[in-house]
Curated annotation (Swiss-Prot):
Gene3D superfamilies, A to Z: arginine biosynthesis bifunctional protein suprefamily, ArgJ beta chain, C-terminal domain, L-amino peptidase D-ALA esterase/amidase
Official protein name in the record: Arginine biosynthesis bifunctional protein ArgJ, mitochondrial
Key word Cell cycle present: no
Organism ancestry: Eukaryota, Fungi, Dikarya, Ascomycota, Saccharomycotina
UniProt keyword list: Acyltransferase, Amino-acid biosynthesis, Arginine biosynthesis, Autocatalytic cleavage, Mitochondrion, Multifunctional enzyme, Transferase
Natural source organism: Candida albicans (strain SC5314 / ATCC MYA-2876)
Active site per the UniProt annotation: 212
Gene from which this protein is expressed: ECM42
Length: 439
């Protein structure tokens, strides 16, 4: 049994510890782990992680990356490898935290390539079989010697498939996170049983548009690269591309997936003959990705609330998502939520300037807004068919005392399309954390 390093990111608060699993179910044919190699300055925080496929050397992989024009070196290198290999034969991920290796010029590209080279060598992979990710401070070169020295140590002594190995891996990719984000799930397709495991990091600089958030999930289901890429893109659009903490899109946003087929069964592809199995897997991965993405919002820097923006009866999914995003990214709305202020005018303002597809996408006279408590108690109407309600401020205050809240907007267009978006409030603590980030 390889060694594991028990380490908590910080002293976990009662709130944070609720979201860290005490056990999990893990897919066959993988080994993971994390160690401290010296990127982080405190001398102990885990900052290097590896995930390895141990079932043959021909796993399928897929990736969705940031559209920020200042793409970090590891993003560029991983995209290139995925494209060159058409998603086939990717067998490991290597990740460092504490330094983003972004806007680091030619040296940054060489460092990312060297991380791939050394990882492939120590894991006895074919050339360019690893994807590389980095997260942390932008604009500084990696302490590459420490990372390249840590990779062999991690690979030879600290990889395994126990729950603690997965917790170490999840911890090692964190920066300002207050808890490691890990989700596992077992599901069936027909007579075959498969497992998903996923982890991600993120608490600030979160407003992804992957057409300093990292995530990866793996399964032992047999899936072709093209099917996995399509499913991942669909799932990310409805999960990681539907969250926001602060409206800032990172240079390093990356979500990758791997499927090694270790659990056997019929290969899942995107042909019509496999439509039922494909659809079932897609539904499982969408639900799984949403669970992971919501953990990022729950760990939003300084956040005290987890808010679901639910837009219903839109003309199109695009309209519904755009309106939900507009509200979720509104600093005025988010600060009102922190202040427990039922200022629904800020919600209407954000609806009104959302980027929608037609003049009929939003009709004020048909628009309704309400607060929906998650405890099943009575909702609170704020606006009904464009007419303001006499708001019970005491009831509003009661609802806003809760950590979780649903803000539901019904556009009344008879289009029948809906979208959810997840956000948090914006607090004084967010400013403190980010003002002190590099100190």
């Amino acid at each position: 049994m390889h060694k594991v390093t028990k380490f908590a990111i910080r002293h976990l608060s009662d709130k944070a510890s609720r979201f860290v699993p005490k056990a999990g179910v893990y897919p066959k044919g993988y080994a993971v782990g994390g160690i401290h190699c010296g990127v982080k300055k405190d001398g102990k925080s885990l900052d290097l992680a590896i995930l390895q496929n141990t079932f043959g050397k021909n796993a399928s992989a897929a990736g969705v990356f940031t559209v920020n024009k200042f793409k970090a070196a590891p993003v560029q290198v991983s995209k290139k490898i995925l494209k060159e290999k058409s998603g086939s034969g990717i067998n490991s991920f290597v990740i460092n935290s504490g330094n983003a290796n972004a806007v680091t010029g030619t040296q940054g590209m060489k460092d990312a390539e060297d991380m791939v080279l050394v990882t492939d060598s120590v894991l006895e992979n074919p050339t360019n079989s690893s994807l590389v990710m980095s997260t942390g401070v932008i604009g500084n070169n990696l302490p590459i010697d420490k990372i390249l020295g840590g990779i062999p140590k991690l690979a030879s002594q600290h990889l395994g498939n126990t729950h603690q190995h997965w917790i170490d891996c999840a911890t090692a990719i964190c920066t300002t996170d207050t808890f490691p984000k890990l989700v596992t799930k077992r599901f069936s397709i027909g007579d075959d049983t498969y497992t998903l495991a996923g982890l991600c990091k993120g608490a600030g600089m979160i407003c992804p548009n992957m057409a300093t958030l990292l995530g990866f999930f793996v399964t032992d289901a047999p899936v072709t690269p093209s099917a996995l890429q399509q499913i991942l893109k669909y799932a990310v659009d409805r999960s990681f591309n539907s969250i926001t903490v602060d409206g800032d899109m990172s240079t390093n946003d990356t979500i990758v997936a791997m499927a090694n087929g270790a659990a056997g069964g019929e290969v899942i592809d995107n042909t019509s003959s496999c439509a039922e199995r494909y659809s079932r897997l897609q539904a499982e991965i969408v639900d799984f990705a949403q669970q992971l993405a919501q953990l990022v919002v729950r760990d939003g820097e300084g956040a005290t609330k987890f808010i679901t923006i639910r837009v219903k009866d839109a003309l199109s999914y695009k309209d519904a998502k755009s309106i939900a995003s507009s509200i979720a990214n509104s600093s005025l709305f988010k600060t009102a939520m922190y202040g427990k202020d039922a200022n629904w005018g800020r919600i209407l303002c954000a609806i009104g300037y959302a980027d929608v597809t037609s003049a009929n996408s939003v009709i004020p006279e048909k628009t309704s807004v309400k607060f929906v408590p998650v405890d099943g108690s009575e909702h609170l109407n704020l606006l009904v068919n464009g007419e303001p309600e006499q708001v019970d401020e005491e009831r509003a205050s009661e609802i806003l005392q809760n950590e979780d809240l649903i803000v539901e907007i019904n556009l009344g267009t008879n289009g029948g399309q809906s979208a959810d978006f997840w956000t948090c409030d914006l607090s004084h603590e967010y400013v403190t954390i980010n003002g002190d980030y590099r100190s």
